[in-house]
Regions:
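GST-like fold's C-terminal all-alpha helical module
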Residues: 108-199, 247-249
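Acidic/histidine-enriched, glycine/proline-rich intrinsically disordered or flexible terminal extensions
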Residues: 208-249
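Phosphate-coordinating loops and pocket residues in cytosolic domains that bind phosphorylated ligands
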Residues: 51, 197, 206
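Short beta-strand segments
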Residues: 10-12, 167-170, 206
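Positions that flank functional sites
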Residues: 39-40, 190, 210
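GST-like domain detector, emphasizing the conserved glutathione-binding G-site
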Residues: 1-133, 147, 235, 239-249
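Polyanion-binding and phosphate-handling cores
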Residues: 174, 191, 204-205, 212
């Protein structure tokens, strides 16, 4: 929806964890403003941003109904679902099924796929291969888990399209980027692409691209090795990585 007269502000960058709440905002038909956070330029460590989230991470939602900034993508999804009365079943067991799979995304899918991205696509030459191999094995198990589950159902949890689908779908784009065969995960790919065809999801991706892509590219090009070390929590300076293999969503 339009940013004109928006009272909701979502701070973020191009990443799956920011895409998740943008999809929810669009699915709910809410007016909101996206604000780019120049993470490669260390904006997340400024006093102004740390006042929004002391952890120095995106996304962060500002909503007058909350009375305080809200960080963590899963918490934002849950809040918006509760606020609007949408995409989260009211009754158990469907409600807890959706919440369980939201937690699977937050505790396993996002962190593990994120680590595989770092160690397989962004680590410096000569890096110890153990980490990449470990996270690849975990990712393979997670992608298989999702494909197996979606062979028997249309949606991830609860019987209908829900916040669990919104949480997991942006991460499913990494299947091929991580070197896995899409044809070996047909149910996962069908589900991913069916969600991608939803008008609200297309609007969300367009808004994210318009707000984040050029701005992020500019700050990334200007970032020093030390800036990137701090962003990636690297313990020693290494040559700036070639980001061409990674599409920030």
């Amino acid at each position: 929806m339009s940013a004109k007269n928006a009272t909701l502000i979502l701070h973020g960058m191009g990443s799956p964890n920011v895409t998740k709440p943008i999809i929810m905002l669009e699915e709910c038909g809410l007016d909101y403003e996206l604000r780019h956070v120049a993470v490669f330029g260390q904006e997340q460590f400024t006093p102004a941003f740390l006042a929004l989230n002391p952890l120095g991470k995106v996304p962060v939602l500002e909503d007058p109904q909350l009375g305080a900034p809200l960080a963590e993508s899963g918490a934002i999804l849950f809040w918006l679902a509760e606020r609007e009365g949408k995409f989260l079943p009211v009754q158990n067991p469907a409600r807890q099924d959706v919440m369980q799979w939201l937690m699977v995304q937050m505790s396993s899918i996002g962190p593990m796929l994120g680590q595989l991205t770092h160690f397989s696509l962004l680590s410096p030459p000569g890096c110890e291969p153990y980490a990449s191999a470990r996270y690849r094995a975990i990712a393979e198990r997670l992608y298989r888990l999702l494909d197996d589950r979606l062979q028997a159902r249309e949606w991830i949890a609860g019987g209908d399209y829900s916040l669990a689908d919104m949480a997991i779908q942006p991460w499913a784009y990494y299947l091929e980027r991580h070197g896995f065969d899409a044809s070996a995960h047909p149910a996962l790919v069908r589900w991913r692409d069916r969600i991608a065809a939803r008008p609200a999801v297309q609007r969300a991706l367009a808004r994210a691209d318009e707000t984040f892509t050029e701005a992020a590219n500019a700050t990334r090009r200007a970032a020093s090795n030390e800036d990137l070390d701090r962003f990636f929590s690297r313990t020693e300076t290494v040559p700036a990585a070639d980001f061409s293999a990674v599409k920030m969503m």
